[in-house]
Amino acid sequence: MLGIRKNIRISVNFLQRRTITVKQKLGKNRPLPGWDPNSEYFRPGPTMLNRLQEHLHDTILPDVLAASYRHDIDTALSTDEHTQKDRLPRWIGDNPYYKNRPPQKMRGNKPLLPVKESVNPKNLPSISKVVVSTMHKEALVDKTQLLSTMMAFRSITGLQPEIVYARKDVSPWKLRSGVPVGVKVTLTGESMYTFLSILSELVLPQLHDFKGLSPTSGDQTGNISFGLPSEVMPLFPQIEAVYEMYPHSLPGFNVNITTNSKDTRLARFFVSSLIPFTDGNKEGYVG
């Protein structure tokens, strides 16, 4: 009898300690999954390509492939097997310690630039993401200055911006670590093409002083960056009608276009189909 009572007591304690899931608590009233059309979180997927994305795919990329064609290069041999994997200088000499020794590092500990590949239909350039960021100097004194900037970024991008905090203490700039100093938004997919189309077709043509991007823009890895003054923000159609309702002035911002191309010249050539470059850009075109 004692053994039976002990087993019953153990089973009762186990049932009391058993965790009850949310599904069991809600029962039939649990929320619908996001893929269910009756759910409040259901969002239908894209039914067509973005206009700018379709233009790049159908018109620009064939032109890029034709303009970058090189008849003196065999694309069949331009594979990873024929590229030089280890481009760091090796130790040369009769010293036995040179054998199996790690290669020498680049001077200044600079990283190696990616190997440029010949353009073919499989590695045509494309835009991976667009990062829009800004730093508000007035936010160092008054943090509420960032509220107007956050609302403006959310209006022109359609996404919730991310607050950027200072990493180091810089006394001449009155900068303290952990203080919010700016905001940024990372755009991908349809929102990225929508932002680029509005910027290139509606905003930049209204700037009388804008003649094009700098011919030297680029970080040698296929990324194009440029800055825009504070006069650009009120030109966006999302802000133009309600600009006077913003309590604080809106700053300028930086745009970083990240492409999958490893050649900066090819990246400039591709981005020039959206935003023009200034005259004298001899390296911006592939020839």
Curated annotation (Swiss-Prot):
GO biological process, one term: translation
GO CC aspect terms: cytosolic large ribosomal subunit; mitochondrial large ribosomal subunit; mitochondrion
Gene3D superfamilies the UniProt entry points to: 3.30.1440.10
Pfam families, sorted: Ribosomal_L5, Ribosomal_L5_C
Top-rank lineage group of the source organism: Eukaryota
GO function term, MF aspect, one: structural constituent of ribosome
Keyword Phosphoprotein: no
Keyword set includes Repeat: no
Region feature Disordered, mapped onto this chain: 80-109
Transit peptide: 1-18
Sorted UniProt keywords: Mitochondrion, Ribonucleoprotein, Ribosomal protein, Transit peptide
Record field: compositional bias (Basic and acidic residues): 80-89
Family, similarity comment: Belongs to the universal ribosomal protein uL5 family.
Biological role: Component of the mitochondrial ribosome (mitoribosome), a dedicated translation machinery responsible for the synthesis of mitochondrial genome-encoded proteins, including at least some of the essential transmembrane subunits of the mitochondrial respiratory chain. The mitoribosomes are attached to the mitochondrial inner membrane and translation products are cotranslationally integrated into the membrane.
Subunit note: Component of the mitochondrial large ribosomal subunit (mt-LSU). Mature yeast 74S mitochondrial ribosomes consist of a small (37S) and a large (54S) subunit. The 37S small subunit contains a 15S ribosomal RNA (15S mt-rRNA) and at least 32 different proteins. The 54S large subunit contains a 21S rRNA (21S mt-rRNA) and at least 45 different proteins. Unlike bacterial L5, uL5m does not bind zinc.
Protein name per its UniProtKB record: Large ribosomal subunit protein uL5m
The organism of origin for this protein: Schizosaccharomyces pombe (strain 972 / ATCC 24843)
Gene: mrpl7
